[in-house]
Amino acid sequence: MEGDGPAATAPQYQPVCPTRDACVYNSCYCEENIWKLCEYIKTHNQYLLEECYAVFISNEKKMVPIWKQQARPENGPVIWDYHVVLLHVSREGQSFIYDLDTILPFPCPFDIYIEDALKSDDDIHLQFRRKFRVVRADSYLKHFASDRSHMKDSSGNWREPPPEYPCIETGDSKMNLNDFISMDPAVGWGAVYTLPEFVHRFSSKTYQA
């Protein structure tokens, strides 16, 4: 079945970045990992940046199940408060997801990622249904800021070791991560979608129809 869909065209697809192992990666800092990936694309393939988006996955309860994650590679999902991936929509209409925390291929054809990592809302309780804030990569690079305070416990200790490079900040902000995690369309940057809306907007099958 997979061979009949986007995977069949995958050999013609040119990834926007090097291998997974060559990407900047820090566990539990997915928002920065994707920011760094956007930065790489801007530096090496400026024109491709226009085809890329940072995608925040969360909901009002900040409880979103995602399958096929390295943190739980077996059949069950990981319940994240939020997760961030890169979406590339090529000029040929192929959509690929770059998830540095998945055990699926890197990059992964959009429709395969939806089927295997996100599955369907029909089988998920209402409070766990995912929403997606889709932000253009150039806007993400320009506006995102994090002082990493969300990764410290009440005693000020790191829950996970922070990246060695300096905190990402802008001229206007040192911390606006919550504006990206929020699924309130009136807040922050980009557009907010439900899972069906996200699939309809970016599925490679939609482009082929």
From Swiss-Prot:
Top class in the EC scheme: hydrolase
InterPro entries, alphabetized: N_Gln_amidohydro_ab_roll_sf, NTAQ1, Prot_N_Gln_amidohydro_ab_roll
Biological processes per GO annotation: protein catabolic process; protein modification process
Primary localization class, coarse: cytoplasm
Domain of life according to the entry: Eukaryota
Active-site positions on this chain: 30, 83, 99
UniProt EC number: 3.5.1.122
The keyword Nucleus appears for this protein: yes
Subcellular location: Cytoplasm, Cytosol; Nucleus
Keyword Cytoplasm: yes
The reaction(s) this protein catalyses: N-terminal L-glutaminyl-[protein] + H2O = N-terminal L-glutamyl-[protein] + NH4(+)
Annotated tissue distribution: Widely expressed.
Entry keyword set: Cytoplasm, Hydrolase, Nucleus
GO-annotated cellular components: cytosol; nucleus
Result for mutant: residue 81 to N: Impaired N-terminal glutamine amidohydrolase activity
Gene Ontology molecular functions: protein-N-terminal asparagine amidohydrolase activity; protein-N-terminal glutamine amidohydrolase activity
Resulting phenotype, residue 23 to A: Does not strongly affect N-terminal glutamine amidohydrolase activity
Effect of residue 30 to A: Loss of N-terminal glutamine amidohydrolase activity
PANTHER family cross-referenced by the UniProt entry: PROTEIN N-TERMINAL GLUTAMINE AMIDOHYDROLASE (PTHR13035:SF0)
Subunit structure: Monomer.
Family according to the record: Belongs to the NTAQ1 family.
Function recorded in the entry: Mediates the side-chain deamidation of N-terminal glutamine residues to glutamate, an important step in N-end rule pathway of protein degradation. Conversion of the resulting N-terminal glutamine to glutamate renders the protein susceptible to arginylation, polyubiquitination and degradation as specified by the N-end rule. Does not act on substrates with internal or C-terminal glutamine and does not act on non-glutamine residues in any position. Does not deaminate acetylated N-terminal glutamine.
Protein name: Protein N-terminal glutamine amidohydrolase
Taxonomic source organism: Mus musculus (Mouse)
